[in-house]
Curated annotation (Swiss-Prot):
The gene is xis. GO terms for biological process: DNA recombination; provirus excision. This is Excisionase. The lineage of its organism: Viruses, Duplodnaviria, Heunggongvirae, Uroviricota, Caudoviricetes. The keyword DNA-binding applies. Keywords: DNA recombination, DNA-binding, Viral genome excision. Excisionase and integrase are necessary for the excision of prophage from the host genome by site-specific recombination at the att site. One of its GO terms (molecular function) is DNA binding. Residues 45-65 are annotated as: Disordered. Residues 50-65 have a biased composition (Basic and acidic residues).
Amino acid sequence: MDDILVTSDLTSRYKISRKTLWSWQSADTMPRGFVCPFPPPDWPGNPNRWRSESIKEWEDKKKIN
């Protein structure tokens, strides 16, 4: 079974605010140097939840080489 990450796990992991996390979901507001926006939650709700595998895939392809 995949590990599940919630919003607070991700804000701690990347040392960002919740607002920054949500702004990363748009290609228009993503920082330069990233090739793709942050993935939407696998399970929206309160709290939002992501599969760790979804986050790992994003981490593997997020940076321009």
